Amino acid sequence: MSDNHTEHSVLPAVTKVIPEQPASPATYLDSELNCPELKQRLETFQSWLADAFNGGISAETLIAARSDYIDRLLGRLWTFYGFDDVPETALVAVGGYGRGELHPLSDIDVLILSKQRLNDEHAQRVGQLITLLWDLKLEVGHSVRTLEECLLEGLADLTVATNMVESRLICGDVALFLQMQKHIFSDNFWPSPKFFHAKVVEQQERHKRYHGTSYNLEPDIKSSPGGLRDIHTLQWVARRHFGATSLSEMVDFGFLTKAERNELIESQSFLWRIRFALHLVLTRYDNRLLFDRQLSVAQLLQYQGEGNEPVERMMKDFYRMTRRVSELNNMLLQLFDEAILALDTNEKPRPLDDEFQLRGDLIDLRDENLFVDKPEAIMRMFYLMVRNQDIKGIYSTTVRRLRHARRHLKQPLCNIPEARKLFMAILRHPGAVSRALLPMHRHSVLWAYMPQWGSIVGQMQFDLFHAYTVDEHTIRVLLKLESFADESTRPRHPLCVELYPRLPQPELLLLAALFHDIAKGRGGDHSILGAHDVLEFAEQHGLNSREAQLVAWLVRCHLLMSVTAQRRDIQDPAVIQQFSAEVQSETRLRYLVSLTVADICATNENLWNSWKQSLLRELYFATEKQLRRGMQNSPDLRERVRHHRLQALALLRMDNIDEEALHHIWSRCRADYFLRHSPNQLAWHARHLLEHDSTKPLVLVSRQATRGGTEIFIWCPDRPSLFAAVVGELDRRNLSVHDAQIFTNRDGMAMDTFIVLEPDGSPLAQDRHPIIIHALQQAMTRQNYQHPRVRRLSPKLRHFSVPTETNFLPTHNERRTYLELIALDQPGLLARVGDIFADLGLSLHSARITTIGERVEDLFVLADKDRRALSIETRRELAQRLTDTLNPNDKL
């Protein structure tokens, strides 16, 4: 088995066609050293870089070529401006330019170094030189310092010190440059231990900005964890401590093995190639692989496939490579700290057993060949880590041995009986995820244990919904499940924290989470394929039939509760009965709701809000009640209507309301109105209607969050365009509608309820209530309905293709049609849908709005003008109108 798991992570081969390189700037005549001429020469050189790259020349070669070209250009200009005659002055490349790494849009950072402060004439020449470079559109960063100023600035600023560590002489006074180098590498200037620890802290802070993972779907090639900066950090540390100027020299000093050097070189080459391609696609410096750039970069790198396949293949390679860099970076920095900086430590290791020992709080091998001789010992190490809370991590040399052993595995670890016992023992232990599964994933042991895991490592989905790759998402699901055992999680997830301790076998839930997305990217239904995989895994690991079937059901149905809660009418008893029939037992319901909440939270940090929480709670308790009542006993709807009315009346009697007037209002309402509102809502509506001038429209906005959002109730004469007018106004006010209940009384008055949220998922801000009420009153009374103006899609959304789909869901209700609409999220969508309903004379009874990244998946409950389900002809016409209206086009 492979250690690196990147065998197919090699960029596509291309045929090398080497174009002729433009003339060196060293040959330019004085008469050619003017801005127009030099600009033309630079454009020619940049075009040559692109042609050479497209012709198959390596990024390494071209990066060095650009650095050399700029060296010669600056050297020629140095002479042209007379600096050869200025004593004790040097032109020094620093930063990435100092390393000789110049991508097409890279900054060119230079230091003009002098023994003494430059006089006015020489300073003026420097200004002329830099101005020319800026006029040439080169991104030049420069500093002019004396040697003393350099050292003082470097002592005060880590970034300046780092730039000086990788400085390189371009031209000028060699002795002065060497004098600076001597000071930089002395013990008085950032001693190696101090420099090392400062760079580690700097890296940790940088990683925090990217949430500690390179798996963000729009990563920064340079700065994300596992990116080029992590390789630079290793080089800086080795350069400062050993004086090593290359990865190969780091082998000579014993900092790297040859295999590790080769891995870093391969990783660096891969990242350079992607960064080089990105710079060719862009016109301004940036290192972020944003969605709108990914396809162009993938095509430039000759990734093949239909639609977004080139992007997904490129990004999978990228994520796998950054995983490798992250592991090497962490291991080597730890090794440097433990084995090099701490050479004089007298602390002796403490034996844990015959195979392992503890160095401080890190587990270490007692026999360096153990993992190769007994691969099951790898699992034994993680079992010790989950059992012994004194163990905080793995010692660096043991990580090195682990990586070596992975490379030499002859079979998956799960084929070894002892390893299987240990794996199941790990799952059954509290803290299994954070103390064992997470480090197993970081060190590719999960992949080495179960081959299925390898297919999802680095697997991305080109959308705005999934914030992480499939493997990273799965680990986050597992961590979220583990958090349900922690009482501190109760405020955010009260239901799950209440239920998790009541699960008879939490390890089965962890196993289901491990496999719930295991089949993503294979084609076919990943839930069904994953259920098949986990059944085989369960049988191999000795689970009995009941346990295996439960885990397989959880994997197969892991989306069921989320879909039912968010995209179905859960106030319809038939929906609850159908869902309950699938769940079958309260135990399975507890497992499923825990997995569902963890899955939503781990998909995207912005997805979980009080609205979703309220939907899942409502579905959970309705299902629990149905299961306890028995599947054959459906609720009596007439009794529910009667119960709601009586409870609402009891609340209103506390206010001494006019019951005759109340009867007059309620007598005009249909049964659905009482069925779909709680007694508190009914009382709230009635209280205000009784006091309201019936000649004017009424708008109510709840002060307390309702089902996680803000409830808006409207009462006014109904008209075909009312829904479109209201949702259009809410959209203009930057509010998202998540639920709508639409009722028309027997007297033609609309009594509609909308649940809305702010863009961040919170209820409507209190100070916005008066503005929204006034805006809706205006929209409700406006005689001439204004069709929503079609606004442009956001730049991010333009790069996603979501064909409009209309599905009419099966139902036994002869008076209603259930329409599921899937479309690209776009401004004014609900209002345009409402327009279509009005044009076709359709009545909307309820709407459930779900936005999933760049797509909406909405449910509408409709009837025709005779209050019956839509005919086949009307369905066909409705589907066509929706498709024609909502499919993205160039006008958006």
UniProtKB/Swiss-Prot annotation:
Region (Uridylyl-removing): 352-710
Keyword vocabulary terms for this entry: Hydrolase, Magnesium, Multifunctional enzyme, Nucleotidyltransferase, Repeat, Transferase
Cross-referenced SUPFAM superfamilies: ACT-like, HD-domain/PDEase-like, Nucleotidyltransferase, Nucleotidyltransferase substrate binding subunit/domain, Poly A polymerase C-terminal region-like
GO MF annotation, one: phosphoric diester hydrolase activity
UniProt-annotated stretches for the region Uridylyltransferase: 1-351
Comment field on protein domains: Has four distinct domains: an N-terminal nucleotidyltransferase (NT) domain responsible for UTase activity, a central HD domain that encodes UR activity, and two C-terminal ACT domains that seem to have a role in glutamine sensing.
Function: Modifies, by uridylylation and deuridylylation, the PII regulatory proteins (GlnB and homologs), in response to the nitrogen status of the cell that GlnD senses through the glutamine level. Under low glutamine levels, catalyzes the conversion of the PII proteins and UTP to PII-UMP and PPi, while under higher glutamine levels, GlnD hydrolyzes PII-UMP to PII and UMP (deuridylylation). Thus, controls uridylylation state and activity of the PII proteins, and plays an important role in the regulation of nitrogen assimilation and metabolism.
Name the UniProt record assigns to this protein: Bifunctional uridylyltransferase/uridylyl-removing enzyme
Recorded name of the encoding gene: glnD
